[in-house]
Amino acid sequence: MKKKKVEIIMGKKKLQILKGSVIKNKMQKSIVVSVERFVKHPIYKKFMKKTTKLHVHDENNSSKVGDVVEIQECRPISKTKSWKLINIKKNN
């Protein structure tokens, strides 16, 4: 298995920033964001689209279903939430 390379800047690791679309917003101060990525198949060498669902902390409940948002990695807020909403790129 390959280990993920983490950049360390002055004693702290660089936090990831991802872009995805909101698929659920029924919880209080939480949303579910779907993030797409492309992965190359090891045998057939074809690029496939994979999606990941992430639970994100939304302090103001400002996002709606269908919005394109930017999220950032943060400390664990609950059992499943370790991402926070930075800004809304495109409103639906």
UniProtKB/Swiss-Prot annotation:
InterPro entries linked: NA-bd_OB-fold, Ribosomal_uS17, Ribosomal_uS17_bact/chlr, Ribosomal_uS17_CS
GO MF terms held by the record: rRNA binding; structural constituent of ribosome
Biological process terms in GO annotation: translation
Keyword rRNA-binding: yes
Top-level taxon of origin: Bacteria
PROSITE patterns per the UniProt record, alphabetical: RIBOSOMAL_S17 (PS00056)
Alphabetized Pfam families for the sequence: Ribosomal_S17 (PF00366)
CDD domains to which the protein is assigned, alphabetical: Ribosomal_uS17
Subunit structure: Part of the 30S ribosomal subunit.
Entry similarity comment: Belongs to the universal ribosomal protein uS17 family.
Record's function text: One of the primary rRNA binding proteins, it binds specifically to the 5'-end of 16S ribosomal RNA.
Entry protein name: Small ribosomal subunit protein uS17
Phylogenetic placement of the source organism: Bacteria, Pseudomonadati, Pseudomonadota, Gammaproteobacteria, Enterobacterales
